[in-house]
Design a protein with these regions (language model features):
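Binuclear metal-dependent hydrolase catalytic cores
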Residues: 2-156
Length: 156
């Protein structure tokens, strides 16, 4: 891994622990979805991993923007994708503010299936003739169960 030693994880923040539809689910009248307990209002699945040298988000679902605002995230070093379902990819376009803030391209770590889905759903971000207002990203291929480094963290 580039001859550098990846650092230890300092903090892990669960950004969302809900279902693929979030909780409450539209039209559901079960006790969880109708509960007034704020713990039962859950955004779609995502986690933020922080080390001393960097911050990585795992999956950018439809709630990614709200999650970043809620946690006051000002810097993001990489995104790692677990799989190609829309509830894990839909927020990719919202990496743009990090492009502007950090003046850098966002590395996206993804399998070949996730890469294909991203290029299909966000084709404008991968076109040769880039124009303003599109996310600036660089896909870095990862394989299941292989170690890689993202944002200074060693991940598998």
């Amino acid at each position: 891994m580039n001859g550098r030693r990846a650092e230890r994880l300092l903090r892990m923040v669960f950004l969302g622990t809900g279902t693929s539809q979030g909780v409450p689910i539209i039209g559901c009248s079960c006790s969880v979805c109708t509960s007034n307990d704020p713990h039962n209002a859950r955004l779609r699945s995502s986690v933020m991993l922080e080390g001393q040298a960097g911050c990585v988000v795992v999956d950018t679902g439809p709630d990614f923007r709200a999650q970043m605002l809620r946690e006051s995230v000002k810097c993001l070093d990489a995104v790692v994708y677990t799989h190609e379902h829309k509830d894990h990819l839909a927020g990719m376009d919202d990496v743009r503010p990090f492009n502007y803030l950090q003046k850098s391209i966002m590395p996206l770590f993804a399998s070949d299936r996730v890469e294909a889905a991203l290029k299909r759903d966000f084709h404008y971000a991968f076109e040769k003739k880039s124009h303003g207002g599109v996310p600036q990203v660089d896909i870095r291929r990862i394989e299941d169960f292989e170690m890689f480094e993202a944002g200074g963290l060693s991940l598998e």
